[in-house]
Amino acid sequence: MLNFDEQIAKLKQMNIFFNIIDTEKANEILRKNNYFFKLAYFRKNFEKKNGGYFIEFAYLSDLATIDMKLRYTMLHLTLDIEHSLKYLVLKLITENNQEDGYKIIDEFLCIDKSYSNSNFDTNSRTPEEVMETKIKNKNEIFKHMNKRGQLPEKLNKYYQNPPAWVCIEFMQLGQFVSFLNFYYKKYNDEELRVANILMPLVKNIRNKSAHNQPIIANLNYDSRLPQYLFEKGNNIGISRNMFGIKNFIDTFATLELHNQVCSNAIIQARYHDLDQLQKRYK
């Protein structure tokens, strides 16, 4: 593993300069604020010429700081969205005369994780296979509450026949996105249409933010832009070029869905964070 002086030497080999921030200050930044791999990762945002990047260390350090603030802000937004959508889904189930809160979960648990592509029809499997899938999916939902192989007493009584209000509370985001899609396909509820389109993109940002992965780096092209997002962006003057960037698509989806499903109080609570972030970008 390179020591801090060797890390700076390596950056110099990449034609990264230390005119704005000198090597002594850069050494301190690498020790206290940003580790080498992550900071160097942002160099890929710049065009490489003659085997080097010819950029200032200060720019990489600033990008890393901005990205950290962006990740913190987006993480809070995705948590707001998750909370608001779980509340909305439970409300819709409660108001649905065809549901009692148990049947929908039982159906969902019987479907394997690839239900959107195969095995959606439980009739194509044996009762034993369906039960195996059900137990596996149920254990997956409650696994982070399982202490030493045993559920807490308050949850244990629900395990055999868990209701929606228990399962949804403890679903991880990926599980909830799958359930949201399942419920929307079953009832085609207009209140969930936009969420069903955007939540897979929101999940991308949540994963990056929660796992400390850069957002404004590795700005790869992606053609999977939902038409809904394109129309929204076009209405507010976002260029087509921006819609070719994967991380931008995911970020825009998060901002749009937050505005769609969260209460005014929650939106206003995040306005200050977004405003400060915008000022920092400038």
Regions found by a protein language model. Give the residues of each.
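Extended intrinsically disordered or low-complexity regions, especially N/C-terminal cytosolic tails and loops
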Residues: 1-204, 216-282
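Acidic/aromatic/glycine-rich contiguous surface patches that form carbohydrate-binding/processing clefts
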Residues: 212
